[in-house]
């Protein structure tokens, strides 16, 4: 049984990846400082070391106590608007700490590294056509630049060390584990599906549509949404590709279909059975009108296919919000 280390494994995407690897027969060790991650969302079968990835003594302990085959790196900061007002934090948490982590792992002989990147590395693609892995990389905010920096660093380190790496560029991640084992408990979330579902269950009074005058069919931004469980399975498939082939890989992870902001809100209203309070607001700086993945590469090379559509994302997200409400009521 291979053992993988997952940084940020108590976070939204990380906790789903933990279940994905456990379900696939791996042993999972997690390093998470729980600054945004939730201990209760972590699979009981995973062993947690609470602390920061910058703590080399902690990492040394993990590597001495376990034979780590590879590392999946999710830890970091992930809110685009926040990165604009506090860029230093994003370069520190995402770029510099990732550099230190990779440097340490290589020095300890870790073979494989799978990095959680983002479609933010593409910036504002022209024309609205789906973007492939070969599209222009032109981030427009510190979050995107911090991710691209790590991508470049991993490639360069691999060239001289032989580190076997994978890079997954996520589009808009949504939904929760269909089995109800974990979900999105992100504090002050900005993800559209999460926010709309919080409004539906009464956690928020309403939500805003940032821009209604885009050159899209209904005037609102169009995005490619991918279910978090599909994304977890993409990590397993990519990791097994690295193990099997010894080749490096970079893949987009998306459905290849676009849904507008208004479409998503209507779908939440339909699933919930009530109208949400929605207000129009000014455009946000740097929001492309359309951002859709060309995920041909991962489909052809790994046979990965998305199993869940937008309705599944919304139904599982709503189920998680209702569960959190019930848990809160039981505690109070």
Model-derived features: positions:
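Residues that form or immediately flank small-molecule/cofactor binding pockets and catalytic motifs
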Residues: 53, 136, 172-175, 212-214, ...
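Short, flexible, glycine-rich and Lys/Arg-enriched loop motifs at helix boundaries
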Residues: 39, 171-192, 202-223
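N-terminal Rossmann-like NAD(P)+-binding domain of SDR-like oxidoreductases, especially those catalyzing
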Residues: 1-173
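Short, contiguous clusters of charged residues that form electrostatic/catalytic patches at enzyme active sites
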Residues: 57, 61, 96-100, 152, ...
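Residue-level signature of the cytosolic catalytic core of signaling kinases
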Residues: 51, 185-189, 257, 306
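C-terminal substrate-binding subdomain of Rossmann-fold SDR/epimerase-dehydratase oxidoreductases
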Residues: 195, 201-332
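Short-chain dehydrogenase/reductase
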Residues: 91, 140-148, 182-194, 224-225
